[in-house]
Design a protein with these regions (language model features):
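Glycoside hydrolase catalytic-domain context in secreted enzymes
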Residues: 1-224
Length: 224
């Protein structure tokens, strides 16, 4: 992450742009077409282990530095994938694993603090990818939320790229959030929500097979 939190203290847009260009050159040399960067989470709880990966606690600063990272990456032909969308950086007690429950953030705070850097990423910098987060909001997992992945992201922000899940975020809809009874219904929920790519290396039984069953059962239409 190139000492992300330290870089925010300098607020050096040119430096971030240069970091992005070097990152893109190295990624291109390896044959990559996209990269899961930048992290646009807002640092709020110092107990959270990923605070060091954030640009800071100010949405303006995070948005401005994030824009430079995105433009630097995409100028070199690499697709930027900002993460983690959305309201991810305030887990209960600062713990990152089994506490991915509703962060209890008011709508106004969500908009002006946690979503603002992402708005800039899509509307100002033209990011072509985004990663959905593990947590839920108001009881609905973000990775299965039509409100976040379609209404806000595509209809409001005008996002035209792909939505990729964080690792196992799809499975967590059943195993952690427990809002669906089986993987077939999970597959239907995430597809209807607006997810395009699932991130995880696992057997077909974990997603491909349930997805086929959901389509055969009419839970996912051809139009979707």
């Amino acid at each position: 992450q190139c000492f992300t939190y330290a870089n925010h203290a300098r607020c050096n847009r040119d430096l971030i742009h240069q970091i992005a260009q070097v990152t893109a050159e190295e990624a291109n040399a390896l044959g990559y077409t996209n990269i899961y960067s930048p992290i646009l989470d807002i640092a709020q709880d110092p107990r959270w282990g990923r605070v060091v990966e954030c640009y800071g606690e100010d949405p303006y600063l995070v948005g401005e530095l994030g824009k430079q990272m995105i433009m630097g990456l995409q100028h070199e032909g690499l697709i930027a994938t900002p993460k983690h969308f959305a309201v991810y950086s305030i887990p209960v007690g600062g713990r990152d694993e089994g506490t991915r429950t509703d962060p209890h953030v008011a709508p106004r705070e969500m908009r002006t603090l946690y979503l603002e850097p992402f708005r800039k990423a899509f509307q100002d910098a033209g990011a072509l990818g985004v990663m959905s987060s593990y947590n839920d909001y108001d009881g609905v997992p973000i990775t299965g939320s039509h409100y976040f992945l379609t209404e806000i992201l595509r209809q409001e922000y005008g996002f035209k790229g792909y939505v990729v899940s964080d690792s196992e975020a799809v499975e967590y809809i059943m195993t952690k959030h427990k809002v669906q009874p089986n993987l077939e219904d999970v597959a239907a929920q995430v597809i209807h929500a607006g997810l395009n790519v699932r991130t995880n290396f696992s057997l077909p039984e974990n997603f491909i097979v349930p997805l086929r069953k959901a389509i055969e059962a009419g839970k996912i239409s051809e139009k979707t």
